[in-house]
Amino acid sequence: MKWLFLGLGVAFTALICGIGAFRRKLPEKTSEDIDGGVVKRYQTDMPKVIESTEIVSFQCVISLIAACEAEGLGHRVYKLDAAVRDGEVLVKYDWRERGGKSDRAEYTAEADFMVRLQKIVSDYDLASQNGYYHNVSGLPDMYGGSLDIVYATDERIHIHDNQSGILPPEAERELILLFGAATKLERE
């Protein structure tokens, strides 16, 4: 009789463990989770024409690490930020090179800074790429670029690609020079 109860106990325990194993969800692995996996989206509901011209926030990452020609701007990753706070335009930039050399600065810009910034956005029709997202899993953060612009009307331009540049080289150069992120030698 003792063996019967022991056998039933073991069978019951095995049944409970088996049910628990079937109910537990294992994490799903998708192809974009592995190194080299790609996520590519076009958000078609994002406007390709922005009505407002009043930028309140601007964030941009430009990578020239893999550029064939950096046009005197160095093979660097530039981070450019500008925002209107209490009527002032606060600007930040920093850049870094693969070897560790870097520079950063923060300053209050002239009143027409955002107007000049909007001119670059308009001249290169950056809104036409609005909603583009491309991400390759496993890449280091020194490649590609991103752009996030918020307007006073809450309109937004958002572009991201962690593999390739998102802006024309001329636009990249104009932005870097506008923010003052280039050194004196690079401006000449």
Where are the regions a protein language model picked out?
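Short acidic-glycine loop/turn motifs at beta-strand connectors
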Residues: 83-88, 150-154
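Short, well-ordered, aromatic-rich surface patches in folded extracellular/luminal domains
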Residues: 23-73, 105-107, 119-121, 125-188
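Short, solvent-exposed loop/hinge segments that bridge or flank secondary-structure elements
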Residues: 68-84
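A structural signal for short hydrophobic/aromatic patches embedded in well-ordered alpha helices
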Residues: 113-119
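Acidic/histidine-rich, surface-exposed loop or edge segments in extracytoplasmic proteins
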Residues: 85-104
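Hydrophobic alpha-helical membrane-insertion segments, chiefly the h-region
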Residues: 12-21
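Feature marks short, highly hydrophobic, charge-poor N-terminal signal-anchor/signal peptide-like helices
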Residues: 1-8
